[in-house]
Amino acid sequence: MKKLSKRMQAVTKLIDKNKLYPIQEAFELIKKTAITKFVSSVDIAVSLNLDTTKAEQQLRGAIAFPFSIGKSIRILAITDDEKKASEAGADFVGGLDKIEAIKNGWLDFDLIITSPKFMGALGKLGKLLGTRGLMPNPKTETVTDDVVSAIKAYKKGKKEYRTDSFGNIHLSLGKTDTKTEHLVANAMALIDLIKSKRPSTVKGTYIKNIALTTTMGPSLKVKLPD
């Protein structure tokens, strides 16, 4: 722990807590602050001026990043066309049998993609899936008539995003060995998407602040790009 503490102290000194870093400089610096022995995740937190008690100010959707974020996910496809879903890259495929397996405690997956047909049966598992963030939703295109295209998109790196109860959006943008320009491009794609989703009822400042961090590392603040 002493070595970790010393390393943390050293990298923290690299960051000016009072500075808003231009986005390119921010990513170049944050990659230098990783303190883990493994390749760390580079994450972004966007704090928004939202009242999440109002449904219209709860942001949720999916983003297809321009560059890979270096994370693979286990997809469960609940569909009638199991063969095509499997060929598209789904890790697990099935129909009502998989829903029954979930009901009995099987949760060895990260994402469910399904068609509207199965939502009646899945909806009965709302308490089990909803609390874990696993319930499919049309907003994230995990409930769709084109299950195959959705599987391919998520396997290529498409990610769900949603505001937490404080109005923050947290996502991984890549890893410390990802090219800086790719991290910047992914960040800009997310920021532009968030800007486009500004609720009409929000007054004044919308994006309050942006911060970057690595796994277990310190954070730094980013100047909002024009």
Swiss-Prot record:
A molecular function (GO) term: rRNA binding
PROSITE patterns linked to this entry: RIBOSOMAL_L1
Entry annotated with the keyword Transport: no
InterPro entries for the chain: Ribosom_uL1_bac-type, Ribosomal_uL1, Ribosomal_uL1-like, Ribosomal_uL1/biogenesis, Ribosomal_uL1_3-a/b-sand, Ribosomal_uL1_CS
Residues that span the membrane, as ranges: none
BP terms from Gene Ontology: regulation of translation; translation
Pfam family, any one: Ribosomal_L1
CDD domains from the UniProt entry: Ribosomal_L1
Keywords, ordered alphabetically: Repressor, Ribonucleoprotein, Ribosomal protein, RNA-binding, rRNA-binding, Translation regulation, tRNA-binding
Domain of life: Bacteria
UniProt GO cellular component terms: large ribosomal subunit
Disulfide linkage: none
Protein function: Binds directly to 23S rRNA. The L1 stalk is quite mobile in the ribosome, and is involved in E site tRNA release. Protein L1 is also a translational repressor protein, it controls the translation of the L11 operon by binding to its mRNA.
Subunit structure: Part of the 50S ribosomal subunit.
Family the entry assigns: Belongs to the universal ribosomal protein uL1 family.
Xref: NCBIfam families: rplA_bact (TIGR01169)
Name recorded for this polypeptide: Large ribosomal subunit protein uL1
